[in-house]
Amino acid sequence: MARQVSLKDTRNIGIMAHIDAGKTTVTERILYYSGKIHKIGDTHDGAAQMDWMVQEQERGITITSAATTCFWKGNRINIIDTPGHVDFTVEVERSLRVLDGSVALFDAKSGVEPQSETVWRQADKYGVPRICFINKMDATGADYFMSVDTIRERLRANAVPIEIPIGAEDKFVGVVDLITMKANIYKNELGTEFTVEEIPSDLVEVAEKYRAELLENIAEHDEELMEKYLEGEELTEEEIKRAIRTATIANAMNPVLCGSAYKNKGVQPLLDAIVDYMPAPIDVPDIKGVDPQTDEPTTRKSSDEEPFAALAFKIATDPYVGKLAFTRVYSGTVESGSYVYNSTKGKRERIGRILMMHANKREEIDKAYAGDIVAIIGLKDTTTGDTLCDMDSEVILENMEFPDPVISVAIEPKTKASQEKMGIALAKLAEEDPTFRTYTDEETGDTIISGMGELHLEIIVDRLLREFKVEANIGNPQVAYRESITQAAEAQGKYVKQSGGRGQYGDCTLRVEPLDNPEESNGIEFVNAIVGGAIPKEYIPSVQAGAEEAAQTGILGGYPMLDMKITLLDGSYHDVDSSEMAYKIAGSMGFRAAVAKAKPILLEPAMKVEITTPDEYLGDVMGDVSSRRGKIDGMNPKNGVHVLDAFIPLAEMFGYATDLRSKTQGRATYSMQFDHYEQVPNSISEEVIGKKNNK
């Protein structure tokens, strides 16, 4: 099958937003107007096309980013729908990694909300160009200009309106296009018909002010336009659009549009803006990678002629076809039935079938081209973040980084017969989601599942029941504690066993000390400071392995140890009896003895929590933060509400959603994410260790 749409007419975009800004509704309307759906589905009644998991339809939130293809004015738009709940930030990171541009949605009543900031920062990290769409202009309290101000203030973004609304709340009837300086007035309920009219007289002055601001902004990024603008010449529509496109792709500005997706107003201009201002795959820098043979950096151009390279950014299990690998093709082409190389795993894979996804409907194609986002069936060893490439032109594209889980619960099947089934199901879910882990606690024999928050684990348990028919009970949440030390200490580890026949002999002296700046480390550093061969070279890795293994179970409560440096200072050996095993045991003994002298402490995860509360509940909310051992880091009043930034230990956050709702009659919201580890106060530390050791 020949390429249907050229690369320059392809757009890979995401839609990112806070949990309730109307993201799924906007996607629905885009699919409706671009002719993919004949009846509009609504999140309000649980029938949206993109929210295809049952849990999503019940909760009215989007959990997995479904990939959808649609066409608009001869362009192909691939849309990745991303979740807005903070427990699912991994899905957002994952989709931003494979997008070329994004539409950031905001709720016109509240402007920037906590999760909008998190998602915006993630998009900054990947340098994704964005246009802003201020949705829900028909809602009570909608305020377009306030929303634009919050984008500028809280996100420090150069948000520049290219439309302004005509009316607001129930009087919202259309928009003024600042490029053409005409008014688009919507005539029918479905928003498919609108008339282009002169700007209403009461809006002319405001429109002229914002148009001048737009022209000044784009002139800054285009010398030719700057000259014309300063000389008072009229700029053509084409020139303005070209300049907006250049500035947007360079991340120098964010065009702002508005509408009400629910009331079908403003969606077609948004589609036009996606085509006009979002980059095609050829407009973004070449994808970076590493040549696995030489470890040298390399790049791949977005072109069908280049060797094949693609990134599997999401694995999903489909009830009918099994494992789907959602994949972004960066360069080259790939055909169904062909063999490719998974360079991350070093394994050959066969491409079974290639599907173009439309929410949960699918169309089979026989070939995928550069710039396409497709689902591949038949990959056995491929997991999230793996690179697929040509056998004879290897590359590993930069991998994605995923945060470690912060909350764990014990889980057991309701019937013993389901034990094996549960194990298989959990393994499948862990394959789909790198922030979800499952393991067996060796001391208690319990199966433990870990994730990014209570909602994340609730949904996992839900999916066990629905997709795998496994009923499970879960225990109380457990916090991922860690241990560390507060001072330097030295100790000897000596393992000698000589009772006839070949004995064992390992002897080492280790120093442990806290790291100066733990933020830059990955937990534990090992340094060999032995000179003069006190321990033969071949045994040093064994000492390191013994010490690092011992660091996995600290001496206070058996939690993994963090933020410390281990130095091998000295040792001795025996010509006959020394062995790798003996040095491994000696390394472990020396480490534990040194840690015992180094004033060990317990660490707990501290969460960065952002709480948005109406002013009248501020005192109660602050008091509650203090009672949870929280520290308030900043306060930001805005329009009758206060936004509090706080650091609160995760151990104190269980059930917080319910408490906050009852304290504020459901009017406050919060979001949290892991920030750092900090020392647990002594009284609590003793209680935690006591509980752990009495198990």
Curated annotation (Swiss-Prot):
SUPFAM superfamilies: EF-G C-terminal domain-like, P-loop containing nucleoside triphosphate hydrolases, Ribosomal protein S5 domain 2-like, Translation proteins. It is found in: Cytoplasm. Keywords: Cytoplasm, Elongation factor, GTP-binding, Nucleotide-binding, Protein biosynthesis. GO terms for molecular function: GTP binding; GTPase activity; translation elongation factor activity. It comes from the Bacteria. GTP binds at residues 17-24, 81-85, 135-138. Catalyzes the GTP-dependent ribosomal translocation step during translation elongation. During this step, the ribosome changes from the pre-translocational (PRE) to the post-translocational (POST) state as the newly formed A-site-bound peptidyl-tRNA and P-site-bound deacylated tRNA move to the P and E sites, respectively. Catalyzes the coordinated movement of the two tRNA molecules, the mRNA and conformational changes in the ribosome. This is Elongation factor G. It comes from Finegoldia magna (strain ATCC 29328 / DSM 20472 / WAL 2508).
